[in-house]
Amino acid sequence: MNPEYDYLFKLLLIGDSGVGKSCLLLRFADDSYLDSYISTIGVDFKIRTVEQDGKTIKLQIWDTAGQERFRTITSSYYRGAHGIIIVYDVTDQESFNNVKQWLNEIDRYASDNVNKLLVGNKSDLTANKVVATETAKAFADEMGIPFMETSAKNATNVQQAFMAMAASIKDRMASQPAAANARPATVQIRGQPVNQKTSCCSS
């Protein structure tokens, strides 16, 4: 086991373009926020190491493009993911309607036991909110996945969302240590330079 950390988890952020996936990642990894953020082209990732229950967890968080034309590119990134955060914009009904389609993508490409979390972002825009909290919560309950509303702009629940995901993955790993050891999905990830933080397509 690498002495620098006890766990290495690969997380994915998925959802429609413009819902704030990159802003959530920027807020969690760098505690910063940009009002104007260039759409992700393909895939970007950042790394943040956190402490939880006396364990050091390295989170490698992949930010995927929401545009339809990148769907086939990003499908390969579902493989080996331990947790997937599905993001919609609380001020954009269509982005919420498309959550079911994103869940279908998870079913198609990800591991059967992957941890999921539904996140309604931009909760600070209360005057423009069109997706009721109750509606989203009922949908998440129906799908059997946790739900949280966040604001990357003012940092509401951003830390909590990622930490809750890390905790749920850690609990799952602890309950099935044999399976976790038998399928080291993190081996190829460790081949990546750990200090690679810049976007692969920053232009």
From Swiss-Prot:
CDD domains: Rab1_Ypt1. A lipid is attached at residues 200-201 (S-geranylgeranyl cysteine). Keywords: Cell membrane, GTP-binding, Lipoprotein, Membrane, Nucleotide-binding, Prenylation, Protein transport, Transport. Transmembrane segments: none annotated. Belongs to the small GTPase superfamily. Rab family. GTP binds at residues 15-23, 33-40, 63-67, 121-124, 151-153. GO terms for molecular function: GTP binding; GTPase activity. A motif (Effector region) lies at residues 37-45. SMART domains: ARF, RAB, RAN, RAS, RHO. GO terms for biological process: protein transport; vesicle-mediated transport. One of its GO terms (cellular component) is plasma membrane. Its expression is weak in stems, higher in roots, leaves and coleoptiles, but highest in flowers. Protein transport. Probably involved in vesicular traffic. It is a lipid-anchor. It is found in: Cell membrane. It comes from the Eukaryota. This is GTP-binding protein YPTM2. InterPro entries: P-loop_NTPase, Rab, Small_GTP-bd, Small_GTPase.
